[in-house]
Amino acid sequence: MPENLSSALETFKQQRNAAEAHYLKANRVSVFFREYTAAVETLLAALWAEHFQNSALCLMAVGGFGRGEPYPCSDVDLAVVSPAPLSDGIQEQIARFIQTLWDCKLMPSVKSGSVDELCESVRDDITGDTAFLEARFLFGNRQTADELAEKMNVQRNVAAFIEAKLVEMEHRHAKSQGSGAVLEPNIKSCPGGLRDIHTLLWIAKAQGLAANLPDLLKQRILTRAEAGMLSHGYRRLAHIRIRLHLNAKRAEDRLLFDLQPQVAESMGYQDENRRRQSEELMRVFYRAVKTVKQLGGILTPMLRSRVSSTPMRVTLRIDDDYIQVNNQIAARHTDIFFRRPEHIFKIVEIMQQRNDITALEPQTLRAWWGATRKINRSFYQNSENRRRFAGFFRSGNGLTQTLRFLNLYGVLGRYLPAWEKIVGLLQHDLFHIYPVDDHILAVVRNVRRLALDMHSHELPYASALMQSFEKQDILYLAAFFHDIAKGRGGDHAVQGIADARQFAADHFLTEEESDLLAWLVENHLLMSAVAQKEDIQDPGVLDAFCKRVQTHERLSALYLLTISDIRGTNPKLWNAWRASLLESLFHAAGRCLAGNDGNPHALFGRRRQEAADLLTRAAVPEKQQKKLWNALGSAYFARHQSREILWHAANLVHDFEPPIVRSRILPQSDSFQVMVFMPNGPRLFARLCRIFSRHGFDILAARAFITEHDYILDTFIVQIPSQHAPEDYPDIQSALEAELNSFIHGHTVAETQSCNRRISRRSRYMPIAPSITITPEEDYPDRYSVEITAVNRPFLLADMAEVFFAHNVSLRYAKISTLDERVEDSFTVFSPDLKNPKIQSSLKQALLEQLA
């Protein structure tokens, strides 16, 4: 590199470092962009002079660099423009120039060609056209730059350009769905991200308006409040993106788990707990994108309407205050929301009641939103406002859209201060993937879908139950309040009771409705915990659950709320196995509350009789049946539910020569049920678990049963790896059965091996602290309950079973609850040695070492 260019490169590095240092000290986005742009342009000036002295070409900044928004590691977008087609010599010259840019580590993205060629290249390329919309002259022949800009502007179909950008935005938002996009959002392309702000400005500039917020304010396109809020949201997002690049040392626009604490700390969020640091950063991020989405809902249709051809305007009178314009509702006088604040809820009430109205007319929305910022205690105390708000839930029609609309524009948080505390609050617990407010609204949506016949095919039984449930509005309210006390410290279910009861008292609920609402909020985790962690075949467990529930109404409401809560937490959590657990508990509790199955011996006898009836219908001799029941023992009927007993019996009675392996594909699921019947042996349960883990199966549930004659009957529910299609399941089943048969007949071993499956970034950088509790069971000497919470990983259950074996602890029952990347496992174990505190402590320590 010539000496003069080496000197220019050194100057650039110094200026770039100075720009970063000034930014880190002053924390001003605009100053960083200005100084970094100047540093790049100084270097480009030297390079241009070296390669194109006295040339007819010109150099233009386009895209983000043209906009004057260069991020630390982003591409430098440029265009080399010629008044005439490029000769071979000029093309070689441009290639050398681009190589020099790479040598200087500028990360160039360069378009080159004649004015006509470049115009033609973007005719059907919306991305290229957008880049040139922000073009600005740098060096060379200015006349060529002006000619290009003029031809581009003449060529551009403004209405088509705007529609294309809006379609592009819709596609971008659609790609930003799913847990990864929520937990590790792309700060540029996510809904409400930087690209949405750019889209607004592009739409404005394409129609001849200003391309920056201060000038749009001067042109009265934005109000002062809107310009201020949009500027604030933009600065927040730009700060995060700059810090992302500086910490990652690359053009990383995703808020990855490993980078979140670093970015948070660099932005001044001080906390020794990395998870809390990250949660605070993400809350700032979510609130910023929410502001952008709020303003986008107002400004995008307003800007679009200035140039787009719209269908014929159809206006209908609604009442003295409102008219309907096509599918929108408009206020006759937009100051009505300031003069008569009760109309803040009235217009929403009208929109909820009428299916032919889908939105507020933009100017009405702008005025309405401005008035909502005046919501205060006096507004809350107005009985008309309270009746309307409660009416949103009593009506149910369009409830999800109504609540999401009110949440988007901050009305829920202003009306209910408790709601404001959960907006954007993320939970790094390895199974929640949404901020608390979004999760709650997803749960409301799920409850509401159960009430609609059009969605009955999703969950037919639960839908039928919901559609016959009399107090649907109380269920909607329970969903709305179930997590409202999150983030306060302590038990959110208990703390939420006061919020629910206060709301009920203020919004004209009866005492009976208030009691049901408060009970559901307090106990919303009860059914999930019992079904997933406890042995619901144990009459004592069922009896304790029913004593908490007490009535069929509560049972139905809790069942419906639990289903909706799990489905709204993380799409990965809901599966056929979890559905069957809840349904089994629901039916068992229903029989118990009705006075049936109250006697445990009667229950066990009924289970045995059901199995005997099945075998008799299959023409199995009574002698053969008796042989099976004697081998399994009476305790078998206490530890297994009817469906398992029927399956075991049908498979064992004809081929009762252990060892035996059987499996079946569970209907409408991605899971197998597997049973193994064989003589007991050392570490047998652990070795079986290793076989499943080696095949990539997640163990969803396991029941380890030892007969009176020292045989094991272990039953597993295992989830098939997600990369397999349903048509592959029979082959996978055959392969698994073959390996298990080989193992139980002694032909292969299943020994300890390392874990090859990668642990997710979320588990590595936002882990949860493992916890273990060991509790003696009062009615059963030497029997203990062991509760374990930890990060999920392959071979975890096998490793824990090895620890039990090493400490002379016999595993009698395992209830595995896999919640995405988190496990909450419950074991029933037998060991006289655990009376000794030292041995119990040693067991805990050994388990913790496996969980770490």
Curated annotation (Swiss-Prot):
Keywords: Hydrolase, Magnesium, Multifunctional enzyme, Nucleotidyltransferase, Repeat, Transferase. Residues 1-318 are annotated as: Uridylyltransferase. Pfam families: GlnD_UR_UTase, HD. Residues 319-672 are annotated as: Uridylyl-removing. It catalyses: [protein-PII]-L-tyrosine + UTP = [protein-PII]-uridylyl-L-tyrosine + diphosphate; [protein-PII]-uridylyl-L-tyrosine + H2O = [protein-PII]-L-tyrosine + UMP + H(+). It comes from the Bacteria. GO terms for biological process: regulation of nitrogen utilization. GO terms for molecular function: [protein-PII] uridylyltransferase activity; phosphoric diester hydrolase activity. Its EC number is 2.7.7.59, 3.1.4.-. Uridylyltransferase (UTase) activity is inhibited by glutamine, while glutamine activates uridylyl-removing (UR) activity. Coiled coil: none annotated. Residues 673-757, 785-852 form the ACT domain. Its cofactor is Mg(2+). Belongs to the GlnD family. Has four distinct domains: an N-terminal nucleotidyltransferase (NT) domain responsible for UTase activity, a central HD domain that encodes UR activity, and two C-terminal ACT domains that seem to have a role in glutamine sensing. Modifies, by uridylylation and deuridylylation, the PII regulatory proteins (GlnB and homologs), in response to the nitrogen status of the cell that GlnD senses through the glutamine level. Under low glutamine levels, catalyzes the conversion of the PII proteins and UTP to PII-UMP and PPi, while under higher glutamine levels, GlnD hydrolyzes PII-UMP to PII and UMP (deuridylylation). Thus, controls uridylylation state and activity of the PII proteins, and plays an important role in the regulation of nitrogen assimilation and metabolism. This is Bifunctional uridylyltransferase/uridylyl-removing enzyme. It comes from Neisseria gonorrhoeae (strain NCCP11945). The lineage of its organism: Bacteria, Pseudomonadati, Pseudomonadota, Betaproteobacteria, Neisseriales.
